[in-house]
Amino acid sequence: MYIMNIDAKVRFDPGKALVVKQKHGIDMESVRQEILAGRFDGDEVKNQDGHPGQRMFLVLIDGYVHCVPYVIEADGTYFLKTAFKSRVYQRRYENGEFEIYR
């Protein structure tokens, strides 16, 4: 896990945001606001072969850990790929393995 300061632009694809909202019930703008407010932790995406260069934010939404994979674009913008709930990270969070700063 690592902590980083976000002092940059954060964006997502509006079309993908609709899919995420319908499929997972997650509002990408709420996720974006949590990240901009510094309320997150982070980790690497484990499958770098399938997702080269991706990392992920870990944010708490309604008390549950959500993974938010992202890439950093050439201009330094953080581009959020998707968002999903994670039982694995929720368990690790509950066990105190990392902290999401509120």
Regions found by a protein language model. Name each.
Residues M1-R102:
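Ribonuclease/tRNase effector modules and their secretory precursors
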